[in-house]
């Protein structure tokens, strides 16, 4: 049975997203830029792809949320990542770190660790990336995960010293973070579609959606749960109307657009899970 409180929180968040239409600054990779923008527009937000060193910091200070995605970094964008993260931190703009490929590629792994000093509001990655970022090993295969999302929970908890909330995505998404009362909670979001990893940029675009939800929710934990749930429900609906990856990609955008608070109430599967012994609240 779904956690009723969490479901209602997500239902309220999706209404807030459509009402406020937050503007996300996405410093993302060249593979995902177009699809990420379409995902944000379909869901109810908007996007600006500002990743040059001259404008990135100024824009981060006024955006609703910022995404820093390490998918295809170069010297210029790496500097813009740091500038944007520092500006967001200073201005109080929520920002998301998506540590794509961390663990398997040393240079970007160093960039990701450096970014942690600016305390991302949320970290979103697959299980291998979360484990690697926490310094606990991890088996990263390109941008794909070779670890189960449940196995990343200890690593995600350790990253709460650097971020307000952390998610490890997979067939089931595991999310940890502090609630409005300051207590650490674990939330599991089920659903989704096996076709998601067959379409490029679905994971990277989730990072953008997290940034959008952070702009309209009271805690980073709420924002992560809302974004993951929106994607889980929309992709499940999309699969019902698709015959393969191509038609799924189109159906997914349509479903992100049509999912509303009532859809969340009827289809979301959100559960609390017990944290390992010794977790301090």
UniProtKB/Swiss-Prot annotation:
EC number: 2.7.1.50
Record has Transcription regulation as a keyword: no
Pfam families named in the record: HK
Single GO BP term: thiamine biosynthetic process
Cofactor(s) the protein needs: Mg(2+)
Molecular function GO labels: ATP binding; hydroxyethylthiazole kinase activity; magnesium ion binding
CDD domains: THZ_kinase
Reaction catalyzed: 5-(2-hydroxyethyl)-4-methylthiazole + ATP = 4-methyl-5-(2-phosphooxyethyl)-thiazole + ADP + H(+)
Keywords, alphabetical: ATP-binding, Kinase, Magnesium, Metal-binding, Nucleotide-binding, Thiamine biosynthesis, Transferase
EC top class named in words: transferase
UniProt-listed InterPro entries: Hyethyz_kinase, Ribokinase-like
Residues that coordinate or bind ATP: 124, 169
Function of the protein: Catalyzes the phosphorylation of the hydroxyl group of 4-methyl-5-beta-hydroxyethylthiazole (THZ).
HAMAP family: Thz_kinase
Family: Belongs to the Thz kinase family.
Name of this protein: Hydroxyethylthiazole kinase
Organism: Rhodococcus erythropolis (strain PR4 / NBRC 100887)
Gene symbol of the encoding locus: thiM
